[in-house]
Amino acid sequence: ELYNRPDCKKELTELEKRIYNYFSSLELPDEPTIYDYLVLSLTHKDVIATFNWDPLLIQAFARCHLFTDNLPHLFCLHGNVAVGYCKEHQEFGLLKAQCPICKKYYPPTKLLYPVDQKNYNDDDYIKGCWDATEAMIEESFMLTIFGYSAPSSDKKAVSLLKRAWGPLEKRQLEETCFIDIIDESEIRKRWEEFIYTHHYQYTNDFFQSYLGMFPRRTCETVFATYMLNVPPRNDMGFHKGMTWNEIEELISDLVHEEETTEDGKNYPLHYTNRGLFS
């Protein structure tokens, strides 16, 4: 392995440079993508923790701000080519932006490569992302794992996630969702320490997931369904091939509800038959 060979330092530096430049060159198409649906399916009470180096999720965040500022937090657990970090003031943002304190442009974040022994404490930004992610998982009602196969090179990462999720006997009400092309039986095997009995959903289609069917009210809808026996409507969410105008129309009522809900209050149940509560 190159990381364990001092004589390959020059080659390693060149390889990392090419990797960084390649991922930096990627761009989203103009039409809506899964990245956009994912970002808009969540609100400020949610977190997206990603292992991806590419800038596509960051680009989705930037254009989803045109619809609402009520978007999820984003933590890049292996760094990201589109994110910069000011070590002096512990501020981060878009790579082309400036630190709000010193007004200097953000230096790029470090990328964490798939080596045998990853150290998540070496880099301040990555450590901060992990600390925040663990804290959010500890307090979460739902956990969605989207296309992450838990490779052998990420054993430490999975261990950290499990530590945050805690023992299953303390997760008897929570729900775990998996969106993946891997067979369901294999998913159950890989993630058995995150699944309490039957409290999980598996799908290979984002639009059939809780996030896709109940965007921006996922936790509220799942809780009402299983804890309060309130049947949801699953025909009101995102669907394939939507235009930006259709997305704006779909989420406009949701955003209005969010803007008019008092701080500390729950958002109204949205994906239900209104007659049940009239």
Identify the role of each PLM range.
Residues E1-Y125:
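Extended, H/D-rich, highly charged conserved domains that either
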Residues A132-S278:
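SIR2/sirtuin-family catalytic core signature
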Residues I19, L42, W53, F67-H73, ...:
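Generic detector of bulky aromatic hydrophobic side chains
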